[in-house]
Amino acid sequence: MHIVVVGLNNKTAPVAIREQFSFGEQEIVDAMIALREEKSIFESVILSTCNRTELYVVTDQLHTGRYYTKRFLANWFNLEMEQFTPYLSIREGEEAIRHLFRVTSGLDSMIIGETQILGQVKTSFFRAQEHGTTGTVFNKLFKEAVTLAKRAHTDTQIGEMSVSVSSAAVTLAQEMYQQLEDKQVVVVGAGETGELTTLNLFEAGAKQIAVFNRTESKAKAVADKFKGRAHSIREIACGLLDADILISSTGAKEAVIGYDDVAAAQLLRRERPLLLIDIAVPRDIDPAVATLPGVHLFDVDDLNGIVNKNLEARLVEAEKIEMKIDEAIQEFQTWLVTLGVVPIMNELRARALDIQEDTMTSLERKLDHLSARDKKVIGKHMKSIINQMLRDPIDYIKDAAAQPDANVRIAQFIETFGLDVELPEQPVDEVEETDATSAKAPLRALMR
């Protein structure tokens, strides 16, 4: 069995292409079921987010698995394969496993180390599992991916460092004041950056947030989401009087907070500390205010230094996660290659159990004076002997499954132990495409 992922993401395709391959919440279940019914495909999970659409499949033949997954995309979205093939990313085997582990851990995201994708992968997997499109392989693989991602975030500091200017501004405020719950916070600007800043402040514990904007209705729309207050920017002088922290991010062409505004406020505030963070370009705050007593001014360049430093630190943490991924891949592949010899191991154990039972029956017949306790002790020791005798053969067959001449070794093993297990006449990868349908039914039963 082979694992294949076919998809496109923000690295391989522009948004104009990606938006054509978005699965809605209502259709994604039908899509996974339909994908699983394609030729040579035994399991399927579809991950569809704003930045990626990826189809994960378990297939018995790489070439047919790739082809029918691409054909499924073409048919589902009513497109010609040639239109989107240049934008596709196709990974197989170890690289497919590595890709899933990296995606789930946030290493393939636009913001390295973000955790939103972990929830999206979990949702996609649980949805597929609920509707029966996963089996033995993906049930194991996706659980391993989720467990690995959780461990990666708890064992490293990859998610603890701000890597956006707005989040860095909030981190800076926390470093200065430790707790934000009792601080008066002013956000100037109600655009995308202003709203994100307000969100970050709210999540950091700020409870007294005032949003100022040229259009008061826009300020209200943002403030209402986070239990804040809305004001026109014309009232900024009043905002400066109360503020402990002010973060500004308007799109104005010139400063909206002048030297005189801050100087007057500080005089009335008796020079109480005021943290001003200007994340606008052009700058919103006159840089001369930094000379005023009690004023601490930071601009976007100061924050970019923090962001770049944190990005470098995240990359160091990412290397630690990559090492964990290498270990997880090795463990999973070891499990995967032994999956095919599970019926052989089961047959060997069953044969040994039959011998044990026959021997025990013979002993009981010949030694009819044995008590129930005697029989229990003898049975326990016989089982221990059998388990010890089976250890080396089972280790051998597991190792044999991973060798280049696996089929020869497995055939010799079956013959040596006289097991009643059938091997395919040829490796699955060599089966002709026309034979895939007939082979699918028994293989699918095994994978379930």
UniProtKB/Swiss-Prot annotation:
Pfam family, any one: GlutR_N
Disordered as annotated region, ranges: 427-448
Pathway stated in the Swiss-Prot or TrEMBL entry: Porphyrin-containing compound metabolism; protoporphyrin-IX biosynthesis; 5-aminolevulinate from L-glutamyl-tRNA(Glu): step 1/2
Catalytic reaction list: (S)-4-amino-5-oxopentanoate + tRNA(Glu) + NADP(+) = L-glutamyl-tRNA(Glu) + NADPH + H(+)
Site label Important for activity, positions: H99
One GO MF term: glutamyl-tRNA reductase activity
Top-level taxon in the UniProt lineage: Bacteria
UniProt keyword annotations, A-Z: NADP, Oxidoreductase, Porphyrin biosynthesis
Binding site for substrate: T49, C50, N51, R52, S109, E114, T115, Q116, Q120
EC numbers: 1.2.1.70
InterPro entries per the UniProt record, alphabetical: 4pyrrol_synth_GluRdtase, 4pyrrol_synth_GluRdtase_dimer, 4pyrrol_synth_GluRdtase_N, GluRdtase_CS, GluRdtase_dimer_dom_sf, GluRdtase_N_sf, NAD(P)-bd_dom_sf, Shikm_DH/Glu-tRNA_Rdtase
PROSITE patterns tied to this protein: GLUTR
Gene Ontology BP annotations: protoporphyrinogen IX biosynthetic process from glutamate
UniProt-listed Gene3D superfamilies: Glutamyl-tRNA reductase, N-terminal domain, NAD(P)-binding Rossmann-like Domain
Binding-site residues, NADP(+): G189, A190, G191, E192, T193, G194
UniProt keyword annotation of NADP present: yes
Active site: C50 (nucleophile)
Enzyme class: oxidoreductase
Role: Catalyzes the NADPH-dependent reduction of glutamyl-tRNA(Glu) to glutamate 1-semialdehyde (GSA).
Miscellaneous comment in the UniProt entry for this protein: During catalysis, the active site Cys acts as a nucleophile attacking the alpha-carbonyl group of tRNA-bound glutamate with the formation of a thioester intermediate between enzyme and glutamate, and the concomitant release of tRNA(Glu). The thioester intermediate is finally reduced by direct hydride transfer from NADPH, to form the product GSA.
SUBUNIT field: Homodimer.
Domain notes: Possesses an unusual extended V-shaped dimeric structure with each monomer consisting of three distinct domains arranged along a curved 'spinal' alpha-helix. The N-terminal catalytic domain specifically recognizes the glutamate moiety of the substrate. The second domain is the NADPH-binding domain, and the third C-terminal domain is responsible for dimerization.
Family designation: Belongs to the glutamyl-tRNA reductase family.
Protein name, as recorded: Glutamyl-tRNA reductase
Species of the source: Exiguobacterium sp. (strain ATCC BAA-1283 / AT1b)
